[in-house]
Amino acid sequence: AYADAEALLINNDFDGAIEEFKKISGYKDADERALEAYYQKADSLQSAGNDKAAAIAFGQSDGYKDSRERSITLWNTIAEHPTLAAGRRHTVGIRSDGTVAAVGGNNDGQCETSAFSDIIAVAAGNFHTVGLRADGTVVSCGKTTNKQCDVSSWENIVSIAASGNHTVGLKIDGTVLATGSNVCGQLNVSSWSDIVAISSNISHTVGLTASGKVVAVGSNNDEQLQVSVWENIIAIAAGTRHTVGLKADGTVVAVGNNADGQCDVSDWTDIVAIAAGTNFTVGLKSDGTVIATSVPK
């Protein structure tokens, strides 16, 4: 089995080699050779220009050689790092020195960010604030009723999302962590893999894979999770009861509640970025103009 695994690696069948080495974990240096296979796979993917998949593969190399450094370098070019975020009644922003300013409602301590440092991204839930540090750890403050602030043990995080009463973190290896309220199943992300972007709202969580597919968990009362047929997606956004995806060709797809026309995006073109709110969707066009679905007064 060991010889078979080595032969697969020599022939650049990286996935096959990884699988075979894992089958004989503990034998000789099989575990280290599996990491070498991950590393060579990542190097090959990066050489081919597939930076998203390469970032994940380097992350799966578990610190082997310079894999963590190479993964972080790639993630810094592909991961979203919002410097501003708004919760239900508060707003937070990253200062140039990596500290965080916050204003607004503070009944639950969601604005008590004075201890935050080395922050590269922020996210805000209804009554809590989350910060991603440059070293991949996460800090938080605010309401803890649903354990939405239980992130102190998280590490190797490259992107964060927060909404309602839950918090989501994307790891360097493309897996996802989540904590907080799970009343609708919005935390059920443990089986996700190859994720390159995350988005969440009150009752659902969405993930974008390196292959351009989309996964979603949580409430499906308005069919906001019906994203399995989407392809060639490069960005995602979760509204309160709808989900939006930006395609590689600049068009946009949306599913979920459409009572206010928030999913009426089929005629949008030349879009380079998207956002979703309670009952509306916004798109940034390549010429710098902004388009939005109508919201009744």
Regions found by a protein language model. Give the residues of each.
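Alpha-helical tetratricopeptide repeat
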Residues: 1-9, 32-46
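Short solvent-exposed coil/turn linkers within tandem alpha-helical repeat scaffolds
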Residues: 20-33, 58-70
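Beta-strand-rich domains and repeat architectures in extracellular enzymes and scaffolds
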Residues: 81-93
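Short glycine/serine- and acidic-residue-enriched loop/turn motifs that recur at repeat junctions
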Residues: 89, 104-115, 127, 142-153, ...
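Conserved core positions of repeat-based scaffolds
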Residues: 90-93, 102, 128-131, 140, ...
